[in-house]
Amino acid sequence: MAVTWLRLEARRRWRSLVVVALLVALTVGTVLTAVAGARRGESAFDRLWAVTLPATITVVPNQPGFDWSAIESLPEVSATTLFVVQDGELITGTGPDGSFSSDNLGFPPGGPGALHTVERPVVLAGRMSVDSRADEVVASAEFMSEHHLRVGAPLTIHLPSPAQAEQSFDPTSAQPKGPLAQVRIVGVVRSPFWLDGPGSGGGVLPTYAFTQKYSQYLFGSDLARTSVYVNALMRLNGGEAAIPAFKADLARVTHRSDIDVWDNYQKFGGPVKKATSYEAAVLLAFGLAALLAALFLVGQTVSRYVADSAEDLRVLQALGLTRRKAVVCAGIVLGLAAVAGAVIGVAAALTASRWMPIGLAAYAEPHPGFSADWLVLAVGGAVAVLLVAGGTALLT
C-alpha cells in the first residue's frame, strides 16, 4: 500500500514534494554551514597550536651580544630557536599588478633549527625552505595575497650596509646601501608566532643560511657597536606550567629580573581566541535564526501537504486502511523528500566549507579549504529528516 501511495503522490503532487525538498535543502545547508563554520573557527588557533611545535615562551632581553648558552641549558628548556630583531631590509618584486616594495622581512633565524624544532609551521602551499639555501624563503598567506604572488615568485632583498645595520636602519626613510640578495618563494607557511592579521601585509622568512651569508649586513661589521640583538623562542618541558620555574632560573643565571618572558599561548592565542569565540557565537546565532525561520516555513508547507492528503487517506481508511498505515503512507512520501533535501543540504554545507572559517579565524586556520565536520553534517541531516517525518506523523 505504501509503495502504491508513493507512486500516486509522486505523480500527482511532485511539485509540492520538490518544494519540501528544496526548503529542507536550504535549511540544512544554511544551518550546518553556520554550525560547522563556528566549530571550525573557534578551534582554529588550538588546532594550529597542536601541529606546529609552538614555542611556549618568547624571551626578550633586547640586548645586543646577549649570551644564550646558560639559558639554553636550563632544565626547563626543551628546544630553542633564536631570531634576529632588526628591520633594515627592503623587499621588492613584481606581481600581476606591477612592481611592489615591502619592509616586511620576518625576523631572520639566529641559529640552526629555526622553523624545524620550534615553531615548525604548517605548509599551506609549496614546501619548506632548506636551511642550507640562502636563496630560499617562505612567505605568509597574507603576503602572497597582498601582492598576488604564487609559489616560485622571485624577490629581491635590499640589504643595508654594515654601517647602516649597526644603527637600526629604517628602509622607509632612506635607500639601503648594501647588496641585493636574490631569493625565491618556495612555500607559504603559518604558525602561531608567525601569524598574519588583518592589514598586516604578511611577511617573508629567510633561512639560517641567509643570516650566515649576510651576517655583516644584518648585524654590522662591529658587533661591539651594533644595536641589533637576538631574542629567543623556547619550548619548555611541562609547557605553560613550567614558566614560573623557568623565570626563577632565568633570574638566577643572568642575575637580572628585568628580562621579559612572554607566555606565547596567552600573548598570541588569547586575542585570537577571544575574537574567534565571538565570531563563532555570531555564526551560531545566525544558524539559530535560520533554523527558527525554516521551522516555520517547512512546518507550514508540511501542514498544507498533510491537509491536502487527508481527504484521500480518509477514503482509504473507510475501505479498511488502518490509521497506522495511513501515517506510514503520508510519512514515507514526505520523508523521502526530506532525505533528498537533506542530502542536497549536506552537499551544500560541504561545498561552503571551502570558504570557512571567516574573520580572524581564517588567519589561524591550519588547513584552509575543504573540510568535512561529519559529526555536525550527519547529525544535522538526520535530525532534519526526523523532524519532517515526525511532524507528518503528528499531523496525519
Cite the ranges covered by each PLM segment.
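C-terminal TM-helix exit segments that contain a strictly Trp-centered aromatic cap at the helix terminus
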Residues: I344-R354, L395
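Hydrophobic alpha-helical transmembrane segments of polytopic membrane proteins
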Residues: L377-L395
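Hydrophobic alpha-helical membrane-insertion segments
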Residues: L334-A347
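Membrane transport/envelope proteins' first extracytoplasmic loop
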Residues: M1-L295, G299-D308, R323-R324, C329, ...
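Conserved G/P- and acidic residue-centered "switch" motifs that form tight phosphate/ATP-binding loops
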Residues: G152, G320, G345
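N-terminal low-complexity Pro/Gly-rich stretches
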Residues: L313, L395-T396
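Helix-loop-helix units of permease transmembrane domains in multi-pass membrane transporters
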Residues: E311-R323
